[in-house]
């Protein structure tokens, strides 16, 4: 019961962070991104078009996870699905922005894969997925404050286990919003610089 909501967060991290980064870098390698850049399509529209399929896929996978958790384990959230999906929307924005930042600084797919894999390991190990944050050393607990996955997992567990409302999740929502704003702004700025 404690792990199921966290595993959903891990899947969203992989789908909405890892895959968009690889997609944009593959466009660079093939050379099609140069053709797209000379078209009158705004950069925001291009980035949105790249991310939208992964957002939709992420929400489909999240919905399937809810269904499987109910069918296989009989686990349903105590709180509302609307709260979970709201948290998921914020987290998807965070991870897709993070993936785009990595792709903007990567020249090849191998480079972006290694960098994303490195950060994914840190995000997962320092999020409280396997080890509760309270049982980590003090220096590790400090690092977790800069981990968006930690806030998403805490929010998911609070909704799943306690039935928390949006008002009770204001701190998690606020931090995820700041991460989303920061990463996506950085992604747009760094994309323009590279062009």
What are the residue ranges of the model-derived segments?
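Membrane-interfacial helix-loop-helix junctions in multi-pass membrane proteins
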Residues: 76, 127-182
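Helix-to-coil boundary motifs at intracellular loop junctions of multi-pass secondary transporters
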Residues: 27-28, 104-105, 159
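Long, hydrophobic alpha-helical segments
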Residues: 4-20
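Short helix-loop-helix connector
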Residues: 37, 41, 106, 131, ...
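Alpha-helical transmembrane segments and their short interhelical loops
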Residues: 43, 47-124, 167-173, 177, ...
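Short cytosolic juxtamembrane segments of multi-pass membrane proteins
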Residues: 188-195
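Transmembrane alpha-helix boundary and packing residues in multipass membrane permease domains
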Residues: 18-22, 66, 70, 100, ...
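Transmembrane helix boundary and interhelical loop/hinge segments in multi-pass membrane proteins
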Residues: 17-39, 195
């Amino acid at each position: 019961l404690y792990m199921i909501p966290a595993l959903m967060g891990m899947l969203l991290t992989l789908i909405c962070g890892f895959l968009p980064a690889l997609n944009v870098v593959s466009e660079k390698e093939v050379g099609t991104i140069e053709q797209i850049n000379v078209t009158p399509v705004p950069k925001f529209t291009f980035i949105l078009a790249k991310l939208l399929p992964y957002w939709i896929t992420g929400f489909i996978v999240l919905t399937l996870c809810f269904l499987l958790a109910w069918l296989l384990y009989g686990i349903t959230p105590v709180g509302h699905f609307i709260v979970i999906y709201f948290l998921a929307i914020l987290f998807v924005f965070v991870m897709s922005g993070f993936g785009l930042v990595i792709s903007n600084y990567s020249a090849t797919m191998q480079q972006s894969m290694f960098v994303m894999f490195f950060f994914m390991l840190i995000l997962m190990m320092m999020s409280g997925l396997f080890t509760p944050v309270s049982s980590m050393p003090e220096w590790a607990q400090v690092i977790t404050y800069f981990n968006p996955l930690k806030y998403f997992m805490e929010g998911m567990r609070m909704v799943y286990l306690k039935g928390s409302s949006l008002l009770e999740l204001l701190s998690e929502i606020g931090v995820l919003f700041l991460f989303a704003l920061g990463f996506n702004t950085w992604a747009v700025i760094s994309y323009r610089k590279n062009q």
